[in-house]
Amino acid sequence: MNYQSYSDTICAISSGNNINQPISIIRISGKNAQSIVSKIFSGKVGENKTITYGFIKENSEIVDEVLVSWFLGEPQGDITVYNNYVGEPLIEINAHGGMIVTNKILELLISNGARLAEPGEFTRRAFLNGKLDLSKADAIHNLIMSKTRLQARNEASKLKGSASKVIKDLLKELSLLIGSIEVGIDYPEYIDDYEEDLKANSKEDINLTRINKLIARLEKIVKSSETALNYFEGIKLAIVGKPNVGKSSLLNTMLKEDKAIVTNVAGTTRDIVEGIYYLDNFIFKIIDTAGIRKTRQEIEKIGIERSYKAILDADIVLHLFDNLNSEDEFDLDIKKIVQENNKNYIKVVNKSDLKSDIKWSDDFIKISAKNNDIKNLEDHLLKIYSGFDFNSEDIFATARQIKLFKESLEYAYAAREEIKNQLTYITAIVDLNNLFDTLQLIIGNSNREDLLDEMFKNFCLGK
């Protein structure tokens, strides 16, 4: 991303682009923020952390009646301390909503010396000014973009620095390990005595203990983070079964809309239909698949092949049965594929409102999609997924963070083998230093511009 200058004064609409919103906020940040706003604001220039009333004017014409919040910093000796979000002079104009007036104020700020901010530039400046690290910036972005209350709660908990503390604790443990190994490099005579003592007392190498402890924590973080990210983005649920068991009816009931064709003709769903299903604090990406059976129609064969692929891609497979028809070879085929691929699997009997002579065992969940009676299914789904600890400090639920943790693990695995097999300690130090640097990237202790560009490009314009 080509930022023109970090010393420029920037501005942007921070309240979104809803044309009918009652109030809008225009944010201005930079060393010339006060002088630029003063050119278009008729009210009093406020002191730091005050709000003043007045009018935005273009020449003598009133554009809007506004409140202006001033965050101009406090002199402390020879420096000015900025206790605000960005860490530099910051002003926010609270105007009446509507894009005509809001854009006019933005236009006046730009014509008087400000420039339009890049996406995420306010937060980028906050990072560069030491007001936050990248783990907190990640939390802010994820909080804004949260799709469920669980996700929002998890990200909000990181605003006090819990994610940063996890990384710093890991770095502290890693520093002890690196220091211990470096002693062995610089003073090998002590290591010989140390290893003889280990053999005599059958004690595990303290360095091996430390790297194993570090690896266990990293593995836990990766597992928790991948699970959480999957839940936050949407759990993929494939509805599979023979034709005409009610898969499309169930999909429509869950989505509360007619997404799929529902008829009495078997095989009418020939492609995969997707929809988003919200259940309490969980998001499910529902996939309604073509019924699995023998067919001579080429187009239906393609749909059935896609159904098998949907099973492989799903996080959980909902195998739907018809209350009037017992299991057969096609149901067994589905069950076999699910078991071979170690998928979460639930068996659901539809049309429970119809009388049947079939005795279904207790592990079958009974519903009636046609009558919108799916509470048993919903309760079961919540039981499966509600046990996960969404408040864990080990959750770092962005693709960027997970990628860096996985890279860290690879360096840790390599270092462990070098320590375990008593290879040269110098090689272990190289991998451990790479591990240290990779963990530092998670909180942003790096001068890499490409890392910052990738980090902030997805932020909204006024953040």
Curated annotation (Swiss-Prot):
(6S)-5-formyl-5,6,7,8-tetrahydrofolate binds at R27, E92, K131, K463. One of its GO terms (molecular function) is metal ion binding. Belongs to the TRAFAC class TrmE-Era-EngA-EngB-Septin-like GTPase superfamily. TrmE GTPase family. Mg(2+) binds at S248, T269. It is an enzyme of class 3 (hydrolase). The gene is mnmE. Pfam families: MMR_HSR1, MnmE_helical, TrmE_N. HAMAP family: GTPase_MnmE. Its main location: cytoplasm. Homodimer. Heterotetramer of two MnmE and two MnmG subunits. Residues 234-386 form the TrmE-type G domain. One of its GO terms (cellular component) is cytosol. Its cofactor is K(+). Keywords: Cytoplasm, GTP-binding, Hydrolase, Magnesium, Metal-binding, Nucleotide-binding, Potassium, tRNA processing. This is tRNA modification GTPase MnmE. Its EC number is 3.6.-.-. One of its GO terms (biological process) is tRNA methylation. Binds 1 potassium ion per subunit. Exhibits a very high intrinsic GTPase hydrolysis rate. Involved in the addition of a carboxymethylaminomethyl (cmnm) group at the wobble position (U34) of certain tRNAs, forming tRNA-cmnm(5)s(2)U34. GTP binds at residues 244-249, 263-269, 288-291. The keyword Magnesium applies. Gene3D superfamilies: P-loop containing nucleotide triphosphate hydrolases, Probable tRNA modification gtpase trme, domain 1, tRNA modification GTPase MnmE domain 2. K(+) binds at N244, T263, V265, T268. It is found in: Cytoplasm.
